Amino acid sequence: MDRSVTICVDSEAAALERFAATQLQSYLVKLFDVRARITTASTEKADARFIVGLKGRPHVERSGGGVPNLSDQGHMLRRVADDTMVLAGGSPSAVCWAVYELVERYGVRYLVHDDVYPENAGPFHLAEVDVVLEPVQRTRVMALIRDNPIGSQFWSLDDHKAFISQLFKLKFNAARLGYAASCPVISYEVKGIRRVTGNMNYAQDMPIDDDNIGREHLGLARSVVTPEFEGAETFDEMHAILKHFLHGLIDHAKSLGIYVSMSAHTMEFPTEFRPLLQDPTTTSIQLGDLTCSEQGDLMNPDHVALVSAVFEAHLAEYGDLDELGFGLPEFAYAQSDFRDCWKRLRRRFGLGDVDIEGLLSVTRESGLTAGGAQRAEREFKSFVGSLDFYDRFFAQTGVLERMADKGIRPTMGLNMNSSHQALAFVHRALPENTRFQVCDYAASRLVCKLRWLEKMDPTGLDPIVMTTVQDDNMGWLPQVSTENLHILLQATHRLGWDGFSLQHWAIGDIDPPMAYLARASWDAGATPGAVYRDHFGHLYGERAVEPLCQVMRVLEDATTILSIPLGYFFPVLGVMSRHVRAETPLNDAALHVGAMYEEVRRMLEEVGEDGVLSHAGSRLAYWSSRMTFSIEAFHEVDLLGRGGIALGEAASARARGDEDDCQKHLSQARDYHDRAIRAGEAAVTVAASNVQDPSDRGGIAAYYHLLVREVNRFVREYVAEIFPSG
């Protein structure tokens, strides 16, 4: 006889509490083929009862066996009788997390694009559990938007909503919207100049046609662009679409109780506003040369008016945000008044004890800045300039007060790639109630600077560390940084920081580190190894655990090596041009990484031969295809370099009048170039054979253009340049 199961909620339960009940109902069907009934009568007879709701609800307090004090994120799972389990939370979101925690204990694992169910969950039962969970990392943020073809550029609104829902199961409680300043997020006008430009993907056209490998995965798309933007041409059209799109994301996130922030790019403007700047940047400060910033007096009236307009447009168009971020452009040029700015800051905030010259010296000499010492000094000085500017700007404009009226908290960030020395004093010079965050291009780069985090007093700042589970500078290569993330979170927790913010691009590779982050956010004793063993055991089977842990170790080493030079396969137009023009084969570091990918592929093949769970084959094939993509991409770069050597030899032979030798080397160059292009085609072909999620679609479209279409053109142009007469 079927067992009767009820899920009891309060008659006045909030929508999210009821959602928690329907989620539990759905999982019970999928796991045990049990069709539970949702009821508001907690005393109704049943073979098994789940009491679901907020702490303080009468039915929870009656059944809970003494529900403990719970924070807004705290949740409790307690079997209080043979036939009764209580799932309670300090907020509606936490009630959902109690349900998801129970479902995980039934054997389900949450991936960022799907759920994985156990092959056999066994008979229905109430789990023997009595646990109260409170967060170790109170703020757990994921960037939802990355204006990049291998990130979410190719995702529909529904794709984003599905991603948010999976993050919620992993107990993420905050989301950040982070479009580039060139995107049509806001509309504004200053002194008769109206914003008229806005572009997605930095206006990089990566066309899609019938020649594209993997065309069958790309629908009717004509370029790598979010489906909702197909056909939009004018700024007003794009702005209306993006605004609707962003509000769709915000509404869905908030329906789950997720806190939403947005980066405002308050000191970076579309180029039509250059005439208003006293000394505008004239060299490109970001991809596409679509934006500019002020190099002169930051407090000149027109610059103040522009910054004000950016703030006010965000408050008017996105007034339902919880946080709004401000700061500097990624590539900052606001250093011109550094000395005067520092003098004002020193007086205003009592910073006379800070050795600014010593910090400048460390900035110049650390060698830890991508872009070199010149960038490091320029951006450190620019950060000092921005602290002074925002202090004066907020005092003059009242923007902070208007943000407070809307319940929006200000957030300021610091790029630790270049300005980490400012952590020695920044906590003393921030606007009141401002949250602070730091970032860098890779987790391993942040770990190199942990000692600087120790210098900052976190009191009142609720600081978070922004890091990556993968970095777009390394392109669409498999990346793992779990051990570095572990070191980082252990340090920030010890120092009293509030949490972390993650950036992602493609999502197919990130489940292992995400599993770690989800567990470590609630368990200070969680380690990468322990989480890996649980994760791989449930996804692939026990025999696969040890070799897959070794795979993660090798990939993490490869990621750390790649984080030093950055940029091998950065998904931007022309990225392969320098490889076409190179006259050297792969360097030792790249060869080392390529060999690591080959070893990982071999290890994955052995895992498959030893046998995995019945539902694991496609995931294992996906990982193998990611290795093959990377191996072929590095092979292409190596062959292009060898082709460049052969072209150089051919040119030298012709210069000395040896046409036979010239033709011999030209033939070698053609062979290398042909093989290089075939390697690029092979890379995209294998990726197209294992498409798992929306970011894969963007990846195969973008890298067909970069590794095949553009390389073909670059080779022809380079050969014609060296041998204009043939």
Predicted region positions:
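Active-site clefts of carbohydrate-active enzymes
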Residues: A332, W452-N484
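Contiguous, structured surface segment used for ligand recognition
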Residues: M1-P135
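Extracellular ligand-binding/catalytic regions of CAZymes and related secreted enzymes
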Residues: Y106-L111, D509-A526, V531-Y532
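Aromatic-lined carbohydrate-binding surfaces of glycoside hydrolases
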Residues: D10-A13, F32, S42-A46, G56-S63, ...
